[in-house]
């Protein structure tokens, strides 16, 4: 049985929509709506996977943020200090005049890792957050 489709409206910046349109055209989607549905499915799968992080985990959180946004660099650092027991190392590079990339390497309890990731994601001015986890070596 086919599901009923709901019509929604979304406001996006021009550059984001143009990039999205280029991607869906290149991938052969029949419509923008199909590309959006696929993107939402991917987002839901990622969120559900991330929500199920339990036990000891190792991995990285990669973030890109605008360091010119008032207080953001300090907020990123404060969050890292709040989870210093988990963080084994971090790398910070300057991508351009305004943007920085940080890779945070961690080893610890999955629920705390998820909490740290969500706090970083919620900061205004953070443009990208990617969490990658793996079980510790002894479980592989």
Curated annotation (Swiss-Prot):
Q: Which Pfam families match?
A: NikR_C, RHH_1
Supply the alphabetized keyword list: DNA-binding, Metal-binding, Nickel, Transcription, Transcription regulation
Question: In the record, what terms sit under GO molecular function?
Answer: DNA binding; DNA-binding transcription factor activity; nickel cation binding
Record keywords: DNA repair included? no
Write down how the cofactor binds this protein. Answer: Binds 1 nickel ion per subunit.
For this chain's UniProt record, which GO biological process terms are given? response to nickel cation
Question: What is the recorded function of this protein according to its Swiss-Prot or TrEMBL entry?
Answer: Transcriptional regulator.
Write down the NCBIfam families for this protein, in alphabetical order: PRK00630.1 (NF001884), PRK01002.1 (NF002169), PRK02967.1 (NF002815), PRK04460.1 (NF003381)
Record-stated family: Belongs to the transcriptional regulatory CopG/NikR family.
Q: Tell me which HAMAP family the record gives.
A: NikR
Know the name of this protein? Answer: Putative nickel-responsive regulator
The species this protein belongs to is Methanococcoides burtonii (strain DSM 6242 / NBRC 107633 / OCM 468 / ACE-M)
């Amino acid at each position: 049985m086919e599901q009923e489709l709901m019509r929604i409206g979304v406001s996006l910046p021009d550059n984001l929509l143009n990039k999205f349109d280029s991607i869906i055209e290149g991938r052969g989607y029949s419509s923008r709506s199909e590309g959006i549905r696929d993107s939402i499915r991917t987002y839901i799968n990622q969120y559900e996977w991330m929500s199920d992080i339990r036990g000891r985990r190792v991995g990285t959180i990669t973030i890109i943020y605008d360091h010119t946004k008032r207080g953001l660099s300090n907020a990123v650092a404060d969050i890292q200090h709040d989870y210093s027991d988990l963080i084994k190392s971090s790398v910070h590079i300057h991508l351009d005049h305004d943007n920085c990339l940080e890779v945070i390497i961690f080893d610890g309890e999955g629920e705390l890792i998820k909490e740290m990731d969500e706090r970083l994601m919620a900061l205004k001015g953070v443009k990208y957050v990617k969490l990658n986890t793996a079980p510790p070596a002894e479980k592989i």
